Design a protein with these regions (language model features):
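PLP-dependent amino-acid enzyme catalytic core
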Residues: 1-330
Length: 330
């Protein structure tokens, strides 16, 4: 049986609209957490600007991914829910989809890299999902995931390249700007591009003139290269501590949005990410995973130029095990 996908997938010309994000927000109300926005005088002084941190590390399943996963699964028919869902993910979408499926009375099968953090695998299993592993350096996860879904008749929910997922992710930026008012810039981690795409649609509607700035690890600069060249570029599997951003190529739909709405993508080193994680822990009293700290790292490293006056930063997740956190901080 061929894999099914949620209906009305949209087109690259009109992937997600502000109305789609409003609809997603209504679906997520009372289900997803309205995560806090953190301010710190210490951080403002270090950066030289007014910084507003949207703390998605406090989201259900530990990251922003729950927003998109729940929005997508909530749109499935009863028959699709009964058959179950599938996904490929390095960890955060895996946990999010497993939880969303459980909440909506469905089941989930997740394709994860063999070297995914143990904490992310354990959490995914804890939400009731089945895990199938693959070698991320020698296998194409999209192809393997599609075959897995086809063999089992499951609905495949991709981690970023679907309009319902993108719209769900955009609700985080919507909440942020509702709380802060207009911002001069929004700095967002970039993996496959779903978070910044949804954020850009929401933010440019609510705060006209806002600068959308993406952040990638130095080893995983596929979106930066793609935006510079005007077409999607594929790179070797990135080797970086930011496992949630170890993506080879931007999504087709996410790239269509981001090439239109994102001003620039800046890069940060693994050491700069570690430094941001340490500062978040020691001074802000929050735990972030490497990918979750990359946008903060860009500000602390002075990578965002010219420096805006009022800046929003998405702390995208906090799914890191204690042993791994201590190893990174050593």
């Amino acid at each position: 049986m061929p894999p099914t996908t949620p209906t009305d997938p949209g087109t690259p010309a009109d992937v997600v609209t502000p109305a789609d994000i409003e609809d997603a927000a209504a679906r997520l109300k009372g289900v997803a957490h309205r995560t806090p926005v953190l301010r710190s005088r210490t951080l403002d002084a270090l950066v030289g600007a007014e910084v507003h941190l949207k703390c998605e590390n406090f989201q259900r399943a530990g990251a922003f991914k729950f927003r998109g996963a729940y929005n997508a699964v909530s749109r499935l028919s009863r028959a699709e829910l009964a058959r179950g869902v599938a996904a490929f993910s390095s960890g955060n979408h895996a946990q999010a989809l497993a939880l969303a499926a459980r909440e909506l009375g469905s089941s989930a099968v997740i394709l994860m890299p063999e070297d995914s953090p143990r904490s992310k695998k354990d959490a995914t299993l804890g939400y009731g999902a089945e895990i199938v592993t693959y070698d991320r350096y020698n296998g194409d996860r999209a192809d393997i995931g599609a075959r897995l879904a086809a063999e089992r008749g499951l609905t495949l929910i991709p981690p970023y390249d679907h309009p319902h997922v993108i719209a769900g992710q955009g609700t985080a930026a919507r909440e942020l700007i509702e709380e802060t008012g207009p911002l001069d810039a929004l700095v967002v981690p970039v993996g496959g591009g779903g978070l910044i795409a949804g954020s850009a649609v929401a933010a440019t509607a609510l705060s006209p003139g806002i600068r959308m700035i993406g952040v990638e690890p130095e080893a995983g600069d596929d979106t930066r290269r793609s935006l510079a060249g005007g077409e999607r570029v594929r790179i070797p599997v990135p080797r970086t501590i930011a496992d949630g951003q170890a993506v080879e190529q931007p999504g087709e739909l996410t790239f269509a949005v981001n090439r239109r709405l994102v001003e620039s993508v800046v890069l940060v080193s693994d050491d700069e990410i570690r430094a941001a994680m340490r500062l978040a822990f020691e001074r802000l009293k929050i735990v972030t995973e490497p990918s979750g700290a990359s946008a903060l790292a860009a500000l602390l490293a002075g990578a965002v130029e010219p420096l805006p006056r009022r800046i929003g930063v998405v702390v995208s997740g906090g799914n890191v095990g204690l042993d791994r956190f201590l190893e990174l901080m050593a």
